[in-house]
Design a protein with these regions (language model features):
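ATP-dependent helicase/translocase motor core
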Residues: 1-188
């Protein structure tokens, strides 16, 4: 599940996080969809920016479905040499865009007019925030790794007012944990 908003959207990704956590997750009408969704990516295709706060309010984020609350996580690709384009993205075997398919998709969405706009041309680049998170998390090898090892189901029981309450939670590993697990796997 990928949702991309326009850059500088009203409220940034914080607005989308509130909408998901306060309206969609608690709504029983969305439950069957949420239950089958393992990975969700939200982006307004902007660089991470906390606007003077601690947590970023714009950028590209990921989470997994949850019954009550799903925290949005940042994803930063490993780039130990601080290169302009992280090595994983620079070396990824991207396919060429088929011009006819591109035109057909734009026609299907009645968006042919955007084809030659500067913003559209910029967004085709491999180093945009949305493309970076999609490449980093949805490349076949990494997506399978995340689905197999990166999602944990936790059943918690606690006493509330003398009664035992049980809650089921689903958590997804943070990007730092993923890189650590991949490094361990490579060493084994």
């Amino acid at each position: 599940f990928v949702e991309v908003k326009k850059p500088n959207n009203h409220g940034g990704i914080v607005a989308e996080s509130k909408r998901m956590n306060q309206e969609r997750f608690p709504n029983k009408k969305f439950r069957s969809f949420i239950n089958i969704t393992q990975l969700m990516i939200f982006s307004n295709n902007m660089e991470y920016d906390s606007m003077g706060g601690i947590d970023p309010i714009q950028g590209a984020f990921y989470c997994t479905a949850a019954r009550e609350n799903a925290p949005f996580n940042c994803f930063r690709e490993e780039n130990p040499s601080n290169l302009p384009v992280a090595p994983y993205h620079a070396n990824y075997p991207y396919k060429e865009i088929n011009q006819e398919e591109e035109k057909q998709i734009l026609a299907d969405f009645n968006c042919q007019v955007i084809h030659h706009t500067p913003e559209y041309q910029t967004n085709l680049g491999i180093n945009t925030p949305t493309n970076r998170i999609l490449t980093s998390m949805c490349s076949p090898e990494r997506l399978l790794f995340i689905i197999k090892y990166g999602i944990a189901y936790v059943k918690m029981e606690k006493e509330v007012d003398g009664k035992i309450e049980s809650t089921d939670q689903k958590h997804i590993m943070r990007y730092q944990q993923m890189f650590a697990a991949l490094a361990i796997r490579q060493q084994l």
